[in-house]
Every structure is written in structure tokens, then in C-alpha cells.
Amino acid sequence: MTTDASPPLQRAESLRAFKIRAVIVHLACLGVFFVPLTSTVLWTAVALYFVRVFSWEAGSHRYFSHRSFKTSRTFQFILALLAALSGQRGVIWWATHHRAHHKYSDVSPLDQHSPRFHSLWHAHFGWLLSQRALDTDLTQARDLARFPELVWLNKYHYLFPLGLLIATFCVGQYTAFFGATGLGASAVVWTFFVSMVLSQQAAFLLNTGLHGVEPGWFRYRRFATQDATTNAWLLAIPILGGAFHNNHHRYMNSARSGFYWYELDLTYLVLKILSWLRVVWDLVPVPQDVLDEGRKSKGHALPGNP
């Protein structure tokens, strides 16, 4: 059952609560200097980092923002839940802001992520520090707001990371999952806080590291888009393919950001495997004319300042 009865503006939390939580989450990472580290804790943190990046790159970004593939309502909710567990807020909130980013990308101050119109701090994180930025205008994502479970998850997204934090501590403290009992603090610091913060910073880096920076030895600009985006092959693995940002802005509806075989897009690879299993389907391909355009390209400089 879907519904159109949701109020247009949804407030998930106060700005004060968000600021307090952001400070706590980042300060908690300093715990790495005070807790023991085992190989199991470290590798679990690494694995969960990639799960978190996949949750927002495949889920919040390619599916909820751009509808680049189809899936069942059940798996749709799983993607939304994973994104919430990763500290990426609700997927409706994520999609409304990201769609606005594409609409005004690097051509208007309405693109809150653009370092061309705002400071690096504002584009990276500062844009979040207003109540308006934290609220969700459900009218900007009516295709998602018709699902009551997504609207509910969007409002109460912060409860799920809290539950995961408690569960992580209990597993580390009272079981030998990480190699011994009594590792609750280590598990929380490394597999929850550090892993989460790094995955969040990876998302923020797309705004400040791949917009408005001239092409260089690890950045290139294949398409002459109106925005100031580049691709960064060096970040392909850490961001699971999302670093081919200029490609993405050339054709944002594609299920893949690495348009060519040599552009490693691990998110697309996982989606392809899921499509073979019929968990997802109808992955949107890159149009042939766009591929041909890219093959002929000798690279482009950034456009002039608007």
C-alpha cells in the first residue's frame, strides 16, 4: 500500500540535536588511541566501510536519487535501512538534496555542494548546519514519499545507528566474535565510529574533491558538462566507482559511473551480480552516443566561472 497523505515538510530532528551528534561521532574516533585493536576488529571495520559506501552509492544515490535500476519493495526498504544504518540519514532527504544538486550543479548558489559558489567548508559539510537543510521537502520526491515505510524511516533514521551502536558493543563485549570477549569499546570505536565517519567523508569528498578542481595526474575530464566535475581513478576503489563523477554528470540516470571497462565501478559490478540473481533488474545502460562521445574526447578543461 502506498499513500499520498504525507505532510509536505518533514522535520526529523532539531539542528541542535544534529550538531551534538556530529560532534560526538567525530570525537569518538579519537578513541583509536585508547582502545586495543585486533586484526578481526580492523578487517570488520574495513568490510563495514565498504558496506556503508555501497549503501549510499547504490541505494541513496543510484537507486533513490536517479532510479537507475528497479527492485522489489522489500529490497528497496533494505537499501533504505542500510543507508540509515550508515549514518546517511533518510533516503528521501538524501534524494531531494541530490536532485537539487544536479539541477543547479556549479551554475547557481542553489547548489549547496558547489565549491564554486561556497567555501570548501560549506560545500563539504557546512551546508548541513541549518534547520532548512535537515528538513525534508517531501514534494521534491513524490515518487519516494508515496511509500509510508520510507517516510517513516526518513523521520526516525537516527534510531537505527543508535541500535547498531548498542548491538556492536554487546557483540564485542560479551561474545568472542572479534577474537575475545571484552572488546566492546574497540568494536564500537573502530567498526562503528571510524568506519562510519570515513564512509561519510567519502560521500562529502565527491562534492569538494571532484567539483571545481582542475584535471591533473589522477583527475581527468572526459565530457564538457556545464558543471565543473572531474573523474578521479585513484578514488575508484574507496568510493566503489562513484569517483567517475564527470561521467555521472554527463548521464546521471545510468546504473554505472565507470562507463568503460577500464573504469573500475565496483558498485555496478555488485548490481550486475544482483541482477543475475533477480534481486534488481532493468539496470539503465549508458547510451551508445554518450559512449561514442567519450571515446572521441581528448579531455576538457573546467568551464569558466558562471
Where are these regions (language model features)?
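Non-catalytic, topology-defining segments of multipass membrane proteins
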Residues: 1-205, 209, 253-306
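Intrinsically disordered, low-complexity coil segments
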Residues: 174-186, 212-230
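Pore-loop/selectivity-filter region of tetrameric P-loop cation channels
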Residues: 53, 88, 131, 236-247
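Active-site-proximal inter-transmembrane loops
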Residues: 143-150, 216-244, 251
